[in-house]
C-alpha cells in the first residue's frame, strides 16, 4: 500500500512542480517512465520508477509507462513483459495502457517531412567515419557536410525513397540542420533517422528506417502530454536538442514538456551497465538476469528484497543534481529495516552441532508455542517441538571461549530460545579431536521462566533433530570485492576487466535444518531465521520436497571486503 510519506522529501523537482501548479502553468502533473526494452531493469531504474510514479502519486497526477523502442535489433517482448512485471511488483500502476514510441512512428515520420519542407533537415550520404571527422571535437568546430545544401525537393525525394527501402542499410541518414559550429556537439546537425532493415518487436517489418532516441523522446513526451520529463544528468547536454525539436516541428500539442535532470544513482560494490550485466550472464559468472547477486529488480526480488524496502532505499538515496554515490550498506539497511517489521520468525541451524539432552526422555516430544513475530500478534504462533536430540550452531559452543563469550561452554549454562536452560556436561570428540556432540542436561524448572538465584546471560537458537526440516540454503554476498569494479586502471592507464574483482565467495550453498514450520512454505515467503538473518524461499527452485532458502541480508551489517 502506497502512502505519500514513502517518497523522497522536498527536493528541487518537487519545488518546480509546486511552482508550476501554483502559477497555473500546468493544471495537473503528467510524468512518464520510459525504459528501452533491451534488458532487465536494475536498481537505478528502481529509483527512477519511484521518482516518476511517486511524483504523480504525490500530486494526484498520472504516470505513463512508455517503451522507447527505437533500436529493433536489441529489443524484444521478453524485456517488455519483464519491465511491466517489475514496475507492478514495485507497487505502481501506469496510466492507461503501456505506450510504445514505435506507435508514434507515423507521426514522427510526418514531422520529419515537415522539417525537410522547412529547410531544417537534409539527407546525408556521409559514412559514419566521415561524419565523425566532419563533426569536430569539443574544442574544434565541425564542418558542414557537402550534402547539407541539397534542395528541399531532393531531400523529400531521397527521404521517401529511404522509407521505401531503395537504399542499403547505413548508406544515408536524415540530419537536422542546426549549427556545425555549436559548442554543444549534440547540436551539430544530429542524425534523426537511419536506414536499418530489422524486424521490430512491435511494428514488425513495416519500417526500414528508424528514428533516433533524441528525436523520438521529446516528441513522444509532447504527444502524451508529459509536463515534467525527468532524466539523469548525462542528458543535460541533450536538453537544447530536446527543446529545438519541439520548437521546430509543426505539432498542435497542448502541453509543452520540459526536461529536468537529476543525478544518477551510483551504487558501490556493483555495476549497472546493461552491457556489463549482460557480459556477466553470457560468461556465466551468474546464473541469469535474475540471479540474486545481480542488481536487477528481478534479481533483488529473488534475493528477497521487498518493494517497500526498495522504495525506502530510493527515498534515502534522495534526488539532487550532485553526485549520488551510495554504499551497498544503505540499500541493505533499508531492506533489513523493512524486513525487521514484516518478516515472521523461525529458527534454523546452518552449521549443526548435535546436542543430546541426557535427562530428557528418549522418544518423548514436548511442544511449546512461540510467536511468529514479537511485535505482531496478528501473525499468530507456531508449535516448536523439542526432543532428546537437538541441533545448535557449532559456533554457539566454545571449548576455549574468548573473553566475553556468553554462549555454551563446558560446564556452562545457556538458554534455548523458546525452551529450557541447558548445561554442558560432556564434550564428545572424534579421532581427529573435532567436537561432534555435546551431552547436556536441562533444568526442568526453567521452561518459560528464569532459574531462581542464578543469571543465565546467553540465549541460542536450536531445532529438534527428529522434527527438523532439511533445507537448502544459499548464502549470498556482494558480487564484487571493491567499491567500483569497473573504474580501476592498470599501470598502462587502461581499465582493468571488471570481472577481475568478482567476489569468489559471493554465494555458498549448504544444507541446514529448520523448524518444521519451514516445510510447507510457498515460494517468495520471507522469514527471519532468528539470530542469523533474513531469508526467502526461492521463487524458482523452492518446492515442498526441495525447500530452498536464499539469504537476503544478515541481521547486522558485518560485511568486510575480501
UniProtKB/Swiss-Prot annotation:
GO terms for cellular component: cytosol. L-glutamine binds at residues 68, 213. A motif ('HIGH' region) lies at residues 35-45. It is found in: Cytoplasm. It holds the Pfam family tRNA-synt_1c_C2. The keyword Heme does not apply. GO terms for biological process: glutaminyl-tRNA aminoacylation; glutamyl-tRNA aminoacylation. It catalyses: tRNA(Gln) + L-glutamine + ATP = L-glutaminyl-tRNA(Gln) + AMP + diphosphate. The keyword Nucleotide-binding applies. A motif ('KMSKS' region) lies at residues 271-275. ATP binds at residues 36-38, 42-48, 232, 264-265. Gene3D superfamilies: HUPs, Ribosomal Protein L25, Chain P. It comes from the Bacteria. It is an enzyme of class 6 (ligase). Keywords: Aminoacyl-tRNA synthetase, ATP-binding, Cytoplasm, Ligase, Nucleotide-binding, Protein biosynthesis. One of its GO terms (molecular function) is ATP binding. Belongs to the class-I aminoacyl-tRNA synthetase family. PANTHER family: GLUTAMATE--TRNA LIGASE (PTHR43097:SF5), GLUTAMINE-TRNA LIGASE (PTHR43097). Monomer. This is Glutamine--tRNA ligase. It comes from Neisseria meningitidis serogroup A / serotype 4A (strain DSM 15465 / Z2491).
